[in-house]
């Protein structure tokens, strides 16, 4: 069985305003394999978030293909794309997007409840994962009662609760101070190893990116050759 999780081939994306065309991604190829940790870095406006949305099947490319677990998004309707994402992907964003009316435990349980996991089983799994990320004593607190770092830990737990094949993270530490950012990022790397989950992170922080197995610099719609980190 192939260990290839996510693949993009000759990927292109352009935006149009009347006759004006603005290319953002230009003929890009990319692969993410099982258990890999990969960072995409680039300046603001370089197209990093656009690329992540394309790789997640959340946006349609102008050209080329994206495949998740050997299934091309282009060959699936919206419902089937959603099912494929929900089965194999987890997401962490710069803004945590936790539901404010739910506590930490309930937020982490949500993906399991969507899958119709029995409530008691979902609660047990969510509680154990929150304990693993250091929030076992905060499971009944709502997002407004948590610090920025704690909220992001809850978001990480929510992304991992279904044991996805890969996690896509868009500036996951962008709203945190340096100390909290280091702690949260290191936690993501630890969980990547523990759960055998591939990790793709978009970040502007070169120090954090240096901790990954591979780095890609996105410049003018292309990747500069990846550098292998030691």
Swiss-Prot record:
Signal peptide extent: none
Record's subcellular location: Cell inner membrane
Descriptive protein name: Lipoprotein-releasing system ATP-binding protein LolD
InterPro entries xrefs: AAA+_ATPase (IPR003593), ABC_transporter-like_ATP-bd (IPR003439), ABC_transporter-like_CS (IPR017871), ABC_transpr_LolD-like (IPR015854), LolD_lipo_ATP-bd (IPR011924), MacB-like_ATP-bd (IPR017911), P-loop_NTPase (IPR027417)
Membrane topology type: Peripheral membrane protein
Superkingdom of origin: Bacteria
Family of the protein in this entry: Belongs to the ABC transporter superfamily. Lipoprotein translocase (TC 3.A.1.125) family.
Gene3D superfamilies named in the record: P-loop containing nucleotide triphosphate hydrolases
GO molecular function, one term: ATP hydrolysis activity
Binding sites annotated in the UniProt record for ATP: 42-49
Keywords: ATP-binding, Cell inner membrane, Cell membrane, Membrane, Nucleotide-binding, Translocase, Transport
Entry EC number(s): 7.6.2.-
Gene Ontology BP terms: lipoprotein localization to outer membrane; protein localization to outer membrane
Coiled-coil ranges per UniProt: none
Protein species of origin: Hydrogenovibrio crunogenus (strain DSM 25203 / XCL-2)
Domain ABC transporter: 6-230
UniProt cross-references to SMART domains, sorted A to Z: AAA (SM00382)
GO CC annotations on file: plasma membrane
Subunit structure: The complex is composed of two ATP-binding proteins (LolD) and two transmembrane proteins (LolC and LolE).
Function: Part of the ABC transporter complex LolCDE involved in the translocation of mature outer membrane-directed lipoproteins, from the inner membrane to the periplasmic chaperone, LolA. Responsible for the formation of the LolA-lipoprotein complex in an ATP-dependent manner.
Main EC class the enzyme belongs to: translocase
């Amino acid at each position: 069985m192939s260990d290839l999780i996510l693949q993009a081939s000759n990927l292109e994306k352009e935006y149009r305003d009347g006759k004006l065309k603005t290319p953002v991604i230009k003929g890009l190829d990319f692969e993410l394999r099982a258990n890999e940790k990969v960072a995409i870095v680039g300046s603001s406006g370089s197209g990093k978030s656009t690329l992540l949305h394309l790789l997640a099947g959340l946006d349609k490319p102008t050209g080329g293909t994206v495949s998740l677990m050997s299934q091309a998004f282009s060959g699936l309707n919206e419902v089937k794309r959603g099912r494929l994402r929900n089965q194999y992907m987890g997401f962490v964003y710069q803004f945590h997007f936790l539901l404010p009316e739910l506590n930490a435990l309930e937020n982490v349980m949500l993906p399991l409840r969507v899958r119709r996991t029995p409530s008691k089983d979902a609660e047990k799994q969510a509680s154990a994962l929150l304990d693993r990320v250091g929030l076992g004593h905060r499971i009944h607190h709502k997002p407004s009662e948590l610090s920025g770092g704690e909220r992001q830990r809850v978001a990480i737990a929510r992304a991992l609760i279904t044991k996805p094949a890969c996690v896509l993270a868009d500036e996951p530490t962008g709203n945190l101070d340096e100390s909290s950012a280091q702690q949260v990022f290191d936690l993501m790397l630890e969980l990547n190893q523990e759960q055998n989950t591939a990790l793709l992170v978009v970040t502007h922080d070169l120090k954090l990116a240096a901790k990954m197995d591979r780095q890609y610099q996105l410049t003018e719609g292309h990747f500069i050759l990846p550098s292998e980190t030691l």
